[in-house]
Amino acid sequence: MGEKYKAYRSVKYHLPQRSWAWNLYGAGMENMGKNGEPEPFSIPQSSDDQLLVRIDSVGVCFSDVKILKQGGSHPKLYNRNLSVEPTRLGHEVSLTVVKVGKNLAGEFQPGQRLAVQPDIYQNGISTAYGYTIPGGLAQYHLIGKEVLETDAGACLLPMHDSMGYAESALLEPWGCVVAAYTQRRRLDPKTGGTMWIIGPPDNTTEFTFSKGLDSPATIVLTDAPPSIKKLASATQAKVIERNNLAPDGFETISRELTDGKGFDDIVMLNPTSANVVGQVARLIARRGTLNLVGAKPLDGLVQVDFGRLHYDYIAFMGNASLDIAASYGEERNRCELRAGRTAVFVGAGGPMGQMHIQRALELPDGPQLVIATEISDERLQTLSDMFAPLAEKHNRTILLFNPNTARQSFRDFVMQATQSQGADDVVVCVPFAALMAEGDTVMKPDGMLVFFAGVPNGTMGAVNLSNVYLSNAQYTGTSGLTIHDQASVMERRIAGTLSPGRSVAAIGGLETAADAIQSVIDSKYPGKVVIFPQIHNLPLISLRELKDRLPEVAAKLGEDMMWTNEAEEALIEKFWQEPA
């Protein structure tokens, strides 16, 4: 370990008199910093309940672009006047503790390395780091109760000694990817909730409800068969009957019985009309469920709110037996890619799509065939360069498809590659409802469709919900992450089953932050851009350019030009200047 790198890691040096930072004073690039440059600020003194931290690395994200474009009108800035109360971008952050307030001495220590979990809530309100709370595009700043005392506790994750600075920052985007394959949906009837059971009129089928009917506090029955009425009356729940309802009356009873919040759990028995199912689906509460139980397909595709699948975690489930409860539970409702099968990633050429592909290829029990779509031939070539060797290394196959230039349709391509079976899993990485709906058409009847990218609530699309109860198809979506998701990425990195550093495509010093954000707008680099705020005079440079421009750093890159801890050490040895 070089002397400069050793001093940097230990934080045993005199702090500088000032810290440089990129404040955001409004919408637009012209409001980032002062005159297009970072500003100097005095390094603040920490109170008894605060940490003074050094920012080591910051990943640049398209979410930063959204904040830059919207300014104070961004949903997580609550119409703040940024010219008076500026914020600071940077939510993918790795940091080192410099000073510890005396009330925190038992929890933190100088030199401790941490990653930020930025998806912060306080009293149920989003106060995200890098949004509401000024973020990491600075050299030093204070951390207090706004990060340490949140609804989820302290939003700081201690780093393993083997973790590099860049890969520690990238735990955040990688955590979002991992979260897409963890169970976010509620899969059992809600305790104390409101359940609505809808049956076709004059139905005498002897349905059962082997477990879970004792959970709701209120059960609403609409044209329920006698068997269900009997089961409901045997519970402690309040039972309400509303029969002979037309679809235009559904919203009225939702307002009456749920204050417009929607039903926590809805059960539809022997559904036949896709239109009716679609109308009912609009009334699912946040994190609510719609359980379809029947043996015959609907009369068409169902219009589903794609935004709510992603942001509200609504769950569609079902089965073809007479036991309503057979639809519930994690065993029946998967969230992970199928081992040894086929996974399709739609719009996979961007940094996040690349992470999904990498995870699938490195997953020990991952899919055997990975299909990636992208409309840019340049990005497709990047995917080939990055992942063809990785696929070969893990004895997997990767196929690439450009729908704009191919002679066959996307569906025909997938069907040809899967012997007309369709894909087991389809992950949509771009926020376009048409592509989300198209993803449903290439899926096996028992496949899984994952909406990783979000579209606004109210964005509708047609899907085949008959497959939910006839074949156990899954429809899922996720937004954000937890600190446990970041921790799981670190655990896999330590175990050698995931390489976050492979996502790094370009690096830069503090002064390049604005250019780095512009590069994301322009899709200039084929992966993540990482800023090192403690380094001055480092231009924004792609890893492909290092061989010619910084050969001593390039020499430390890993296979396939992967960013490594050794490259990071060489970078710090060359550029970091210990404060005088």
In which residue ranges do the predicted regions lie?
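Residue-level marker of beta-strand positions
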Residues: 92, 112-113, 140, 289, ...
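Glycine-rich beta-strand-centered segment in the early N-terminal region that forms part
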Residues: 42-59, 73-120, 135, 160
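NAD(P)H dinucleotide-binding glycine-rich loop of Rossmann-like/cofactor-binding domains
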Residues: 79-82, 91, 118-195, 316-319, ...
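Rossmann-fold NAD(P)-binding glycine/threonine-rich loop
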Residues: 275-278, 294-313, 437, 453-472
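ADP-ribose/adenylate-binding Rossmann-like module
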Residues: 268-271, 284-301, 425-430, 441-460, ...
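C-terminal hydrophobic helical "lid"/dimerization subdomain
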Residues: 2-17, 246-256, 260-261, 265-282, ...
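Mid-domain Rossmann-like dinucleotide-binding core that forms the NAD(H)/NADP(H) cofactor-binding site
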Residues: 163-247, 334-404
